């Protein structure tokens, strides 16, 4: 037929075969064209949405174009950021085409751009000192889980924190000799945190600008009560991760009534537990679910995964495209917690700190993946953060 030869011989294919209103499976000649585009060696650029992809769900309607690039017209659609849609879209580029704002914006979401991160990150003043770069407190670790406290501390240090204190239990305090820059102290005599330790920890925390709580804490009932004491009494910013998220659900903590500014960093499984939903439901409604949760609880939510979604309490969300499969290893989330805490300590508000922290964390992994796609560790990612930060702030 007339269209076969160009598809087989062209260098670039512009896909504008089907628009955003697709409601049934693709068939007939259109299906044949999509199959030929996917079999072609040419670069494929889809206009607004890859043909055959549902713009609302991100699911292929029978079959869909596997684009190298997708140009989102006037607004991002759910398929650009939801799985599996984003895999069909390739790299998503944004283009305004002059539509009124009310018509153009169908989804309150934006992709995080390197330029935006560079503009958000604070520049160091020539005369600054460690006291101006944030005193970070990390409540983490339990017997056998000291590595989580270590990694969160590493993340904070390499993200530029002025001082980092790790508060843990005695058996996890062995990290004190691993990183001399960490100020490690222990409380109590138990293998895990208990509610009886809350008062001492809060007294220590009076000196801190921001807290991070959760990595490696464990899920003992006493630890859950300890977490509730901290969250309901701490009045400064706090990053809530890992086992502390489990306590939020089990102790029925009303996040909207907590006095501090909260940043929650669950992965899909943790968010499913937190909301009483299945992991499949969370993935299917990754953006809308994150936005609803952040607005209802008045928190900043970092829903980790591919892609990571940062939802603000004003109802807007940001989608991160940095990061790669090599980062699917233990401890990556602990490192991210430390990075975000460090940025909050550098006088960033929770929302931009989460945006920048997630982007830098993923970019650090991407830089490592250029040399070693698989096999690098969370510690390696932490050590790469200064280079990633330098890259995004270069003129």
Give, region by region, the residue ranges found by the protein language model.
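Internal gly/pro-rich beta-alpha loop/helix module
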Residues: 11-12, 17-108
């Amino acid at each position: 037929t007339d269209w076969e030869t160009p598809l087989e011989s062209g260098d670039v294919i512009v896909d504008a075969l089907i628009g955003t209103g697709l409601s049934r499976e693709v068939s007939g000649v259109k299906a044949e064209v999509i199959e030929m585009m996917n079999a072609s060696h040419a670069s494929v650029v889809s206009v607004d949405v890859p043909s055959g992809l549902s713009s609302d769900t991100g699911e292929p309607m029978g079959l869909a174009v596997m684009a190298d690039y997708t140009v989102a017209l006037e607004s991002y659609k759910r398929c650009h950021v939801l799985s599996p849609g984003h895999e069909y879209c390739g790299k998503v580029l944004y283009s305004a085409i002059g539509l009124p704002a009310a018509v153009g914006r169908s989804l309150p979401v934006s992709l995080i751009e390197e330029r935006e991160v560079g503009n958000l990150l604070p520049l160091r003043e020539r005369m600054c000192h460690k006291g101006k770069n944030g005193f970070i407190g990390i409540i983490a670790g339990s017997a056998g889980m000291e590595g989580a406290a270590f990694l969160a501390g590493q993340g904070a240090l390499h993200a530029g924190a002025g001082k980092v204190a790790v508060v843990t239990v005695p058996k996890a305090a062995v990290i004190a000799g691993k990183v001399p820059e960490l100020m490690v102290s222990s409380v109590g005599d138990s293998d895990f945190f208990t509610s009886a330790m809350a008062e001492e920890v809060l007294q220590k925390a009076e000196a801190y600008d921001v807290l991070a709580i959760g990595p490696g804490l464990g899920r003992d009932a006493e630890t859950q009560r300890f977490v509730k004491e901290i969250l309901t009494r701490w009045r400064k910013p706090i990053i809530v991760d890992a086992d502390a998220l489990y306590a939020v659900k089990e102790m029925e903590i009303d996040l909207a009534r907590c006095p501090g500014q909260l940043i929650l960093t669950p992965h899909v499984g943790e968010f499913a537990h937190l909301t009483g939903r299945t992991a499949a439901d969370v993935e299917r409604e990754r953006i809308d679910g994150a936005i609803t949760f952040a607005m209802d609880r008045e928190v900043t939510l970092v829903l980790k995964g591919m892609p990571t979604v940062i939802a603000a309490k004003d109802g807007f969300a940001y989608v991160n495209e940095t990061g790669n499969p090599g980062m699917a290893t233990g401890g990556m989330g602990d490192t991210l917690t430390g990075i975000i805490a460090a940025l909050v300590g550098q006088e960033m508000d929770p929302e931009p700190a989460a945006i920048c922290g997630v982007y830098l964390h993923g970019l650090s992994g991407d830089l490592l993946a250029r040399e070693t796609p698989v096999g690098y560790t969370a510690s390696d990612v932490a050590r790469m953060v200064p280079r990633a930060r330098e890259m995004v702030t270069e003129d």
